[in-house]
């Protein structure tokens, strides 16, 4: 029996099943309106809420964490500063030279975080931050050896900004306690501890006491500040100066930030709010932590695959449900779960009689990465040959042409939902801040980073289409400039340190 005959299934039944699944992933204009309105409501509640954490309380709203960043750079800043960046998979240490003309020079050491720190629950916070301290010393030894040779009064201290891309309760520009891990980390004893203090202690142990961690930020705020610095006073297409309004990340995770009027941030202590306003500081950058939007699922749709991924495979069940529908970490996992289900229903991969016979990689959570989906998304080759090769290489999984057509339809629906949901917080912020109507033309800039929005084929186009369908409409979408903020977390952390 030939391979194709062995795999032959009821094509009509498979097609019907895929149509049903794709339909469950659709986000139409009405749903965009509904979600955007609720997002604004959750922003308002979050700005007024003084409790800490991300408990699933309907009235709590979004975290809306004050960052204590009260001004934005304009490209004229100068100086040499250090930055450290702990992301979802890598740790970077950077030396950033701000040239004062919207440009910068950077030296960096990037290290892949060892698997044991990501997946082992027995790892302690001391072990993790000791690793960060050792990698920082390796960077200094390579790029700033003069710091290690200096002694006593000859030591010239260097400011460092620390980009920590996880939810923290930030009480000042230079301190913040971890609320909870997201993405891959599971080190429970870090929760509730000041991450700046943990890092500074390990730097001191490594003989790097000349480095002062003076600013705590996250990748999203860093991206926003970096974008503001490099864009300077860029004229818009209408001849006006376009205004930076939002910083956002669409990569392993997703999040956003924006400048909010201090008088609206009721969660700040009254005396602090009064003092800032007296000092002439009228706005503060708010870290939204929008990955946790609608954890109660009051308005977000949930397929059975979303529920399974959250409850069975994610490191933080019940939290960051919005992120689990958008971010690159979960796109491939959603497809993997759908394929396993279609096999269980006897609609695909008929050569494997039961679940146990399926290739190990197809049964392994998070084995199917978004890079594979990106190749499938744009595959227009004869017989979908690129899709066939991608599955053979990534999962050791042979497929028929009918199966590949079904897989491509699923991939396109998964990523379209991701891009459409990504438009919700952007539209909500623009409406809440009235940014599109502040001036005659009202053109705005959105600084972004993350491999999904930067590299995934068609993601930005789908995002723009969703924005046009959202409450801001076609006219609002046309006023938006999407700008890539490369190396945002490193440069942004340095900019935070500069003003500390």
From Swiss-Prot:
Major enzyme class: transferase
List of residues that carry N-acetylserine: 2
Binding positions for ATP per the UniProt entry: 110, 487-492
Entry keywords, A to Z: Acetylation, ATP-binding, Cytoplasm, Glycolysis, Kinase, Nucleotide-binding, Phosphoprotein, Sporulation, Transferase
Location, primary (coarse class): cytoplasm
EC number: 2.7.1.2
Region Glucose-binding, residue ranges: 159-185
KW Acyltransferase (keyword) present: no
Inducing stimuli: Repressed by glucose through the MIG1 and MIG2 repressors.
Superkingdom of origin: Eukaryota
Reaction catalysis annotation: D-glucose + ATP = D-glucose 6-phosphate + ADP + H(+)
Pathway per the UniProt entry: Carbohydrate degradation; glycolysis; D-glyceraldehyde 3-phosphate and glycerone phosphate from D-glucose: step 1/4
Function text: Putative glucokinase involved in phosphorylation of aldohexoses and glucose uptake. Involved in sporulation. Required for the full activation of the early meiotic inducer IME1.
Protein name: Putative glucokinase-2
Gene giving rise to this polypeptide: EMI2
